[in-house]
Amino acid sequence: MAKKNVEETVECFKMSEKLKKDMIKKYGQIFRSGSDIIEENKNRIYIPISPAHDSNTGGGIKEGSFLGLSGMPGTGKTTTALQLIRNAQRPEFGSRKTFYGDIESRLDQRNIDGVSGLDGSQEMMTVFRPTEQAINAEDSLTVIEDTIRQNEKMIIVIDSVSTLISKSELEDEISGQNRSLLPKILKNFIRRNAIPVQAKGHIVVCIMHQMADMSMSRKTKTMDGGNGIQFQCDNILEIKYVTPWLDSENKRIGQFCNWEIIKSSGAGLTGAQYESALRYGYGIDDIHEIIGAAMELGIITKGGSWYKADFLPETGKEGKRQVQGQDKVASFLRDNPKIVDDIKVKLQEILLC
């Protein structure tokens, strides 16, 4: 009796294997072991944004994922996306090319020049933008979908999701009566392209404005684009507020963007808040941020106004490796870019270990 049960089990297993082969023939290699999935995820490359972002998101943004950048207009979302693009262009991250969906038609040379080291040439960065009239959301997303499916390992930016307008809204008379179809269109786009984005190793950046929600009894702000796109995004980073960055003469040289991790599917801690330093005409100030990140992870220690680290020059008779004041640390690092690169590597190793 036991032998018969074993034979039936073996026969059932054979049938399952035949069914599996038939399904693979029809749909492709859709069966993998759990260890294969783990190994595949382990080999994914993380693209850094900046030290402050990376130390809070678990090392940067993983290829094959969706990133949502949210906040009020003019708070630094586009600059942050361009910073990610600049880093992705570096050889150690695959010299990745960019498709920039400039739906708002606001990207200009000032934005490109405002991120130090960004290559805005057509070879590295293709910009899709309406010229004479608005292009409906369906057509815009079709162009982006074709780009996703026909290329590999690109940074693809939608700037912004909030500006997309459905075909019916674009062609009908202007009125406030019709409920926006955009969330449904975006949800469909996301569903169709979630797997191709992962398979092709892209990073899709969805820039979303905070919009006033007047349907509640009190004024609230909400991310535009609907729940579908928020559900799909692996990471959602939101700028809660900005504060001025003033120099010693009280002149504004930039702004501090105060971020919150709204969602993280990686090592980032949902709800974590941190500050990113955006310097006008330069982009995110890596030196300013790297000092903060290195202090958080113990690479730099501080006692009073003295900053101590193995890489700092020896001072005094005792030969202590320390300098007084953050400005002196920053000045030393700017004069020693090789040390900055070494610190970045060390930070990545700690964050991704």
At which residue positions do the language-model features occur?
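Conserved inter-motif catalytic segment of the P-loop NTP-binding fold
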Residues: A2-K3, Q83, A88, E92-R179, ...
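Long, well-ordered amphipathic alpha-helical subdomains in the mid-to-C-terminal portions
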Residues: D286-Q324
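Charged, alpha-helix-enriched surfaces in structured cytosolic catalytic cores
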Residues: K14, K18, P48, G64, ...
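Terminal-proximal interaction/regulatory segments of ATP-powered molecular machines
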Residues: K308-A309, T315-C353
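Peripheral, non-AAA+ core regions of ATP-driven protein-machinery
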Residues: A2, I24, G28, R32, ...
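Short hinge/gating elements
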Residues: F66-G71, E173-S180, D213-K219, A272-Y280, ...
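The Walker A/P-loop phosphate-binding site
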Residues: K3-Q122, D146
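Phosphate-binding/switch region of NTP-binding enzymes
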Residues: R179-L297
